[in-house]
């Protein structure tokens, strides 16, 4: 890598390059060639030729000098892949210039294989992932696993026995039980299948971005056995016909279980109430309007009262439309330095305070999705202390990244609501640890490549991440922010309880939705890629943990 201290002995000229990213890291040359530069889009108007020491201290403290060092996991991984809060390994090669997302590459990192997705060059000849679908539930024994069940509090090494799609016994096998298949799970952790409350399947309407088959297939690779899909489809999920279509195609795909979230208003326009009872009968487990605000607060209040009458769950994505309009990043030092329009913290807290008051008035069971600020988490904690029936979730990347990730105008970090400050990230982590936020979701939003090949403000927001949900979440354990049982609870029983789903537990007679993973192994993100959306900033990173098996209703939907 040009400019790195170890290169200067061989190439004295490399040491003369101006290092502004901290020791050993130089700012890459910017290219303006009359087109978008992918996730390295051209800055709006401001020049960056001079960085003061104060700016470096305030804006760039997260860039680490140990870039491209071995990941240092206890298992002895020497993959030299960066951690998820470091720059991507594939972003700087050869000459040191930044490669645009989607640029053709002569070698390995983004090579597409005939099965779809991206693999390293040395993996082209073989697929490391074996997907078996369409099988009937197997008669299976899982032997010697560390079984963690947050609902019962179990955390011990024991056996699991599965028959006819159900978990028949934990510990000793039932009398006369003869498995047709056994898994030696010594050293593995067996946990309830993960439950993800926010996975955009992109179908119907946006098949260029993803499909129900591709995204549920990616979900089981991340250990997800049950997921909720939001109503932002085309047509909008505001009729029973659309809900039935999604469920039929999910059953045909045969991977994760899908629980649709219906639209609270017709067309998500915030004017007329959708047919909530018909949607519930068609299989919708909750209702929401996404980031689309109601035009009239009285209409929203009536919708909540109606939902409370039938004990329906309403999902809020609290963001004030006027305060957030036109914003691209958190309104702070990074946005000011980059010249990006900001979205203040109050865009969340103002709307959240209003929504909590309406929940208190109506008595509806409410779930607040995609919290981004520490003050927002504090408002949820106060509401729970008052006895309000409210729960909350946070996108996993909000617990890992901050707005400092935008410093190179990478559109891979363009998300809505935006990444916020370190203080917000730390506050959210503390809320997850204490249980105020009881669910962690991927907020999976797959995009085609063209969606990110534009200047930053013209790109579509979102990160494709459901395939990495468990390995990414394991970074919180590696960093000492959560212990493993707490993490499993926030990924399984917590989200299941929030939306009252029949999932997230290991008990005799329960559906055999199980994830088996190796906490001591590592995953290099992108070695295999099953989602249609490759808009993931973590590709090329070394992540702790590796999913070995995912069982859905007793079927092995994924094995590695």
Task: Please report, for each region that a protein language model flagged, where it lies by residue.
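Glycine/threonine-rich flexible loop motifs
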Residues: 42-64, 205-207, 293, 297, ...
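Adenosine-phosphate binding glycine-rich loop
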Residues: 76-132
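Metal-associated gating/positioning segment near the N- to mid-region
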Residues: 185-253
């Amino acid at each position: 890598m040009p400019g790195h201290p170890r290169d200067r002995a061989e190439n004295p000229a490399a040491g003369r390059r101006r290092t502004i990213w901290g020791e050993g890291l130089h700012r890459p040359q910017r290219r303006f060639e009359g087109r978008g530069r992918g996730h390295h889009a051209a800055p709006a108007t401001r020049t960056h030729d001079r960085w003061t020491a104060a700016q470096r201290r305030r804006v760039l403290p997260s860039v680490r000098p140990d870039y491209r060092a071995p990941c240092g996991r206890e298992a002895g991984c020497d993959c030299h892949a960066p951690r998820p809060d470091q720059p991507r390994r594939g972003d700087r090669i050869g000459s040191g210039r930044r490669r645009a997302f989607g640029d053709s590459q002569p070698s390995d990192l983004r090579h597409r294989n005939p099965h779809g997705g991206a693999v390293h060059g040395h993996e082209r000849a073989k697929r490391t992932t074996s997907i078996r679908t369409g099988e009937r539930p197997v008669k299976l024994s899982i032997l010697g696993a560390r079984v963690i069940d947050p609902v019962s509090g179990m955390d011990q090494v024991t056996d699991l026995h599965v028959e006819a799609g159900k978990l028949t016994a934990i510990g000793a096998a039932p009398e006369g039980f003869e498995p047709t298949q056994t898994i030696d799970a010594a050293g593995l952790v067996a946990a309830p299948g993960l439950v993800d409350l926010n996975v955009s399947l992109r179908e119907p309407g946006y098949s260029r971005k993803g499909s129900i088959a591709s995204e549920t297939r990616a979900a089981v690779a991340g250990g997800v056995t049950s997921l909720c899909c939001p109503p932002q489809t085309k047509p909008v999920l505001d009729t029973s016909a659309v809900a039935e279509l999604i469920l039929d195609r999910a059953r045909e795909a045969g991977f994760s279980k899908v629980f649709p979230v219906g639209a609270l208003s017709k067309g998500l326009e915030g004017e007329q109430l959708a047919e909530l009872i018909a949607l519930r009968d068609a299989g919708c487990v909750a209702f929401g309007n996404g980031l689309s605000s109601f035009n009239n607060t009285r209409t929203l209040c009536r919708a909540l009262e109606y939902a409370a009458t039938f004990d329906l769950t309403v999902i809020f994505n609290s963001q004030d439309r006027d305060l957030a309009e036109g914003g691209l990043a958190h309104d702070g030092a990074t946005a000011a330095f980059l010249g990006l329009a900001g979205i203040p913290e109050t865009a969340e807290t103002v709307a959240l305070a209003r929504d909590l008051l309406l929940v208190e008035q109506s008595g509806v069971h409410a779930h607040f999705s995609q919290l981004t600020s520490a003050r927002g988490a504090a408002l949820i904690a106060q509401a729970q202390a008052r006895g309000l029936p409210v729960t909350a979730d946070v996108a996993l990347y909000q617990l890992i990244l901050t707005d400092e990730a935008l410093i190179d105008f990478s559109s891979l970090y363009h998300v809505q609501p935006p990444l916020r400050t370190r203080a917000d990230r730390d506050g959210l982590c503390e809320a997850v640890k204490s249980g105020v936020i009881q669910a962690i979701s991927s907020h999976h939003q797959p995009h085609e490549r063209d969606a990110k090949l534009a200047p930053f403000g013209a790109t579509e927001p979102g990160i494709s991440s459901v395939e990495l949900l468990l390995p990414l979440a394991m970074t919180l354990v590696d960093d000492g922010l959560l212990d493993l049982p707490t993490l499993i609870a926030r990924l399984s029983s917590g989200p299941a309880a929030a939306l009252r789903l029949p999932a997230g537990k290991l008990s005799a007679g329960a559906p055999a939705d199980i994830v088996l993973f190796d906490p001591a192994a590592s995953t290099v993100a992108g070695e295999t890629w099953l989602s249609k959306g490759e808009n993931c900033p973590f590709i090329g990173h070394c992540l702790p943990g590796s999913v070995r098996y995912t069982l859905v209703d007793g079927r092995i939907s994924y094995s590695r």
